[in-house]
């Protein structure tokens, strides 16, 4: 186990994030999950995040990542959820049909 360090401390901070699709709808397949992972990998360096593991099922995603103590996890999650939602709905229009019904 290799520890990370900065000027005054040594640390090893792992986070396990589980993101669940609204109403547990069956949205994720391999292609959509791969694109969501690409988006996470694009955003993560800006927050000093290193992706360790990525798993998915049809209605959720498990993300294991390493972070630094000064990382604002809430801002990372907010940024990722906003960007991934916008981009995935744009690139995969079938997602909108699974999340929204035509009646009210």
Predicted segments, located by residue:
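Basic nucleic-acid-binding interfaces
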Residues: 1-104
């Amino acid at each position: 186990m290799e520890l990370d360090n900065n000027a005054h401390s040594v640390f090893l901070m792992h986070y396990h994030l589980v993101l669940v699709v609204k109403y547990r709808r069956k949205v994720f397949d391999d292609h959509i999950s791969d694109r969501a992972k690409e988006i996470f990998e694009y955003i993560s360096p800006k927050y000093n995040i290193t992706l360790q593991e990525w798993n998915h099922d049809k209605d959720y995603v498990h993300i294991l990542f390493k972070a630094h103590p000064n990382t604002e996890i809430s801002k990372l999650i907010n940024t990722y959820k906003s960007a991934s939602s916008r981009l995935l709905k744009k690139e995969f229009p079938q997602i909108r049909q699974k999340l929204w019904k035509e009646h009210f």
